[in-house]
Amino acid sequence: MSHSLNPLHAPQAGAIQGIIIALTAFLPILAIVSLAPAVPTLIQHFAGVPYVETLVPLMLTAPGLVIAIAGPCTGWLADKFGRRKLLLSATLLYGICGTMPLYITSLTGIFCSRLGVGLAEAVVLTIANTMLIDYFDDKQRRFWLTVQGVIGPALAVLVLASSGYLTALRWNGAFMIY
């Protein structure tokens, strides 16, 4: 990873940046929690696909695998291309790949979109945590890490309820959360 910024020239951030960084930590939770209520519906919808009972749960966890594989490289990419530019690009990729299952109907296509979500998450999480270190001193960092720990479970409950409702409306409704 990159070396620390010179404290005399370190960028300063306020509450808005802290909230944004805290919310980005919720993305991996969103990727898994949002689809959990949809698993039975997705298995039923793709009943004609061989091994669907295995493929749908794998699709659910695919972003985590990509995070584990791509995560170590994302710090280098952030240093090479710039944090802000890469963060914005990854956030756009997250939105595009997250909503793709609303427009595509093949399990393979949805699986690929989930891999894209994982790649975007790897970049967003790495850069967000790096920015937390860059922008905040130790005391502020502890505060924003606590905020992350508090809002994650609260948002997860909201996402679970919303996902269940949206899945009841249509087989791919859970992807509307993205």
Write out the residue ranges for each language-model feature.
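Residue-level signature of mid-helix packing/kink "hotspots" within the transmembrane helices
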Residues: V33, P63-P72, A122, A156-V157
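Conserved MFS/SLC helix-loop-helix module at the cytosolic interface between two early adjacent transmembrane helices
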Residues: A68-T108
